[in-house]
């Protein structure tokens, strides 16, 4: 673990009270842990905006009986084989499937993949969760 630095900050009482309620609801053990997570999240957003390298997961549900949807999804995934690390396919019921796609690459590549999958007719829902690649 890297060396820890202590510093002080000044906040309005209403802001710190709201923050304390938030960290309590999220079960943080301390303000420091919550603040570290907020800083990491903001740095990740900056990395995303600047096109840096990210890792993450695309989670989508779709109707596998929709004509030609499976072929389209597979074609798109093959076009992004350098971005996709792995996929997991789950049968939810007779008509619906859940697919989890682990990804790594530039933010632009990952977002382009997610968008191309999301707009296909028959895709019910798609969410993208990103994290740092390192």
UniProtKB/Swiss-Prot annotation:
Reported cofactor(s): Ni(2+)
UniProt keyword annotation of Ribonucleoprotein present: no
MF (Gene Ontology): DNA binding; DNA-binding transcription factor activity; nickel cation binding
Cofactor note: Binds 1 nickel ion per subunit.
SUPFAM superfamilies: ACT-like (SSF55021), Ribbon-helix-helix (SSF47598)
Binding site for Ni(2+): 78, 89, 91, 97
Keywords from the named record: DNA-binding, Metal-binding, Nickel, Transcription, Transcription regulation
A Pfam family per the record: RHH_1
Biological processes annotated in GO: response to nickel cation
Protein family (similarity comment): Belongs to the transcriptional regulatory CopG/NikR family.
Task of the protein: Transcriptional regulator.
Name the UniProt record assigns to this protein: Putative nickel-responsive regulator
Lineage: Bacteria, Pseudomonadati, Chlorobiota, Chlorobiia, Chlorobiales
